[in-house]
């Protein structure tokens, strides 16, 4: 998850490749009461990263988000990033498997009576182990139990994991809007590796 906003290329004399993206907005208006997701592995731990260091946050954001074209927070300096993630309304939780960071989620509780799931994802090495639904359930539980809210929402991108939308809907989120956007390909600008490609992300070369 992570909305890749449009940015112009550094060299304005060159033709900038634009990527077309569909941003899908989903919401949950009450806490789910259905069947719980079973714990997929043993030796799991979910810990809140209180006053998370910038270096550790960058590791999580870059490692989890690179395959899915997360790049906005790569563009900002350490002091600006620290100011963002150290706001009292931001909560960051990290999933560990046998002591190794396997994924994270970030909640924004700034708005009254609603919470935004800003970022959510797994380290690539841990994809395919049924950890995604388990971590999402933990994020939902935290959002609904930490304070009184009437809405939990998020948005996902065309370039997110191909199962992302389905997983969100299975967890109880409902689509309420879509928006078409275009943005300069961050691989051309050196923000992400040029070799990065997956469906529907076309190769550069």
Where do the language-model regions lie?
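Conserved acetyl-CoA-binding loop-helix of GNAT-fold acetyltransferases
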Residues: 122, 128-143, 165-170
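Acidic/histidine-enriched, glycine/proline-rich intrinsically disordered or flexible terminal extensions
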Residues: 18-21, 182-205
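Short amphipathic alpha-helix that is part of the acyltransferase structural core
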Residues: 38-72, 194
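Acyl-donor-binding surface of acyltransferase catalytic domains
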Residues: 1-50
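Conserved beta-strand-loop-alpha-helix junction that forms the acyl-donor binding cleft
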Residues: 127, 154-164, 181-191
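Conserved GNAT acetyl-CoA-binding A-motif
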Residues: 143-156
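Short acidic/polar active-site loop segments enriched in Thr and Asp
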Residues: 91, 150, 174
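A conserved beta-strand-loop-helix scaffold within acyl/acetyltransferase catalytic domains
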Residues: 75-79, 85-124
């Amino acid at each position: 998850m992570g909305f890749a906003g449009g940015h112009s290329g550094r060299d304005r004399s060159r033709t900038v490749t634009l990527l077309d993206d569909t941003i899908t907005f989903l919401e949950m208006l009450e806490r789910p009461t259905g069947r719980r997701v079973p714990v997929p592995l043993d030796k799991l731990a979910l810990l809140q990263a209180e006053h998370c260091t910038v270096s550790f946050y960058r590791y999580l954001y870059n490692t989890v988000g690179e395959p899915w074209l997360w790049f906005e927070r790569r563009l900002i300096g350490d002091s600006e990033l620290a100011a963002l993630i150290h706001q009292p309304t931001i909560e960051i939780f990290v999933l560990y498997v046998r002591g190794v960071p396997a994924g994270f989620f970030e909640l924004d509780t700034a708005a009254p009576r609603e919470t935004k799931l800003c970022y959510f994802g797994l380290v690539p090495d841990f994809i395919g182990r049924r950890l995604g639904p388990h971590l999402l359930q933990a994020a939902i539980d935290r959002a609904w139990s930490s304070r009184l809210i009437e809405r939990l929402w998020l948005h996902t991108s065309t370039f997110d994991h191909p199962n992302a939308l389905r997983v969100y809907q299975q967890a109880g989120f409902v689509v309420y809007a879509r928006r078409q956007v275009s943005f300069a390909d961050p691989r051309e600008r050196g923000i992400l590796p040029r070799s990065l490609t997956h469906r529907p992300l076309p190769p550069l070369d």
